[in-house]
């Protein structure tokens, strides 16, 4: 799971009780904490089946995502564009940022259930020591996913096939 070092600012309590008022940076940190919990829970549940869970922070990467988010704020976009040459000098390229994901996916003998930063084991929040929270998050996620399924998957596939052939 691609996470972020921003998970360090999040709390387990916030995983189940959203902050009021809503703050996108707090929500971002909470989502990254949840991703790491999920990776570690996958490791606990499926290691005996040779499935490994990894979480990682790829590093700070120069991409155009900030520019797209600032499209409706011209003065902030101009400021971002002004600082872009400096950002390009200090931030990783997308190719460099991908290296930690590649390492976790392909390194023989790498032990799952770890958090990596820039191709090395990283230090994660002590909140991640709480395995009961990880199990609760797993259960809550299963509940949410099952609530989205309104009919059996085999029925959905047949229905989708009928709809697709009707449009041909």
Name each model-derived stretch.
Residues 110-168:
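C-terminal helix-and-tail extensions that cap enzymatic domains
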Residues 39-43, 102, 138, 142:
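Non-transmembrane alpha-helical segments in soluble domains
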């Amino acid at each position: 799971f691609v996470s972020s070092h921003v998970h360090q600012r999040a709390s387990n309590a916030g995983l189940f009780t959203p902050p009021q008022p809503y703050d996108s940076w707090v929500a971002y940190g909470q989502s990254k904490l949840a991703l790491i919990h999920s990776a570690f829970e996958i490791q606990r549940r499926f290691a005996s089946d040779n499935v490994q869970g990894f979480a990682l922070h790829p590093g700070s990467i120069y991409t155009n995502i900030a520019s797209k988010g600032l499209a409706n704020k011209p003065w902030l976009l101009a400021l971002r564009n002004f600082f872009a040459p400096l950002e390009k000098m200090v931030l990783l390229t997308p190719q460099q940022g991908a290296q930690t994901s590649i390492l976790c996916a392909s390194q023989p003998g790498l032990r799952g259930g770890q958090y990596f930063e820039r191709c090395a084991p990283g230090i994660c929040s002590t909140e991640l020591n709480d395995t009961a929270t990880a199990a609760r998050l797993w259960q809550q996620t299963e509940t949410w996913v099952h609530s989205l399924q309104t009919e059996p998957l085999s029925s959905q596939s047949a229905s989708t096939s009928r709809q697709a052939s009707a449009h041909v």
